[in-house]
Design a protein with these regions (language model features):
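Preference for extracellular/luminal or secreted protein segments
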Residues: 1-54
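Enzymes and membrane/adaptor proteins characterized by extended Gly/Ser/Thr/Asp/Glu-rich
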Residues: 41-119
């Protein structure tokens, strides 16, 4: 058994109780759904409702969109999820991997090309 009071979880008694009760009350379908992190190709409320309520996803990998749209999707999904979701995005080049208006920074090869290991 994993000690969720220890690092990296560091849960208090109330947090441990929530985890145990939540797991106990989940259906098999909900537990399987927690393993799924689909790619979010759409901000359409119908699509979001479908992946959240029909598949019980454990998270979502966002594709690039405007930051306001991404924030709205994120808020909607978190508000309608029984369990907090993992959020994933392609961030290896900065915030522009989730939001088209996010900050971009050099990729690994660009940084290496500077010849400056402090970059």
């Amino acid at each position: 058994m994993i000690d969720i009071k220890a690092a990296p979880f560091n849960l208090d008694d109330e947090g441990v109780k929530w985890v145990e009760e939540t797991k106990q009350n989940m259906t098999l379908e909900e537990k399987i759904g927690q393993l799924m992190i689909p790619i979010g190709y759409s901000a359409d409320p119908g699509y979001l409702q479908h992946v959240m309520l029909d598949h019980h996803i454990g998270g979502i990998l966002y594709r690039c969109g405007e930051s306001e749209e991404m924030q709205a999707c994120h808020r909607w999904l978190q508000e309608h999820s029984k369990i907090p979701l993992f959020i994933a995005a392609n961030l290896e080049a900065g915030g522009d991997g989730i939001a088209t208006d996010g900050t971009s920074f050099g990729k690994q090869m660009e940084i290496a090309a500077t010849g400056d290991p402090e970059q």
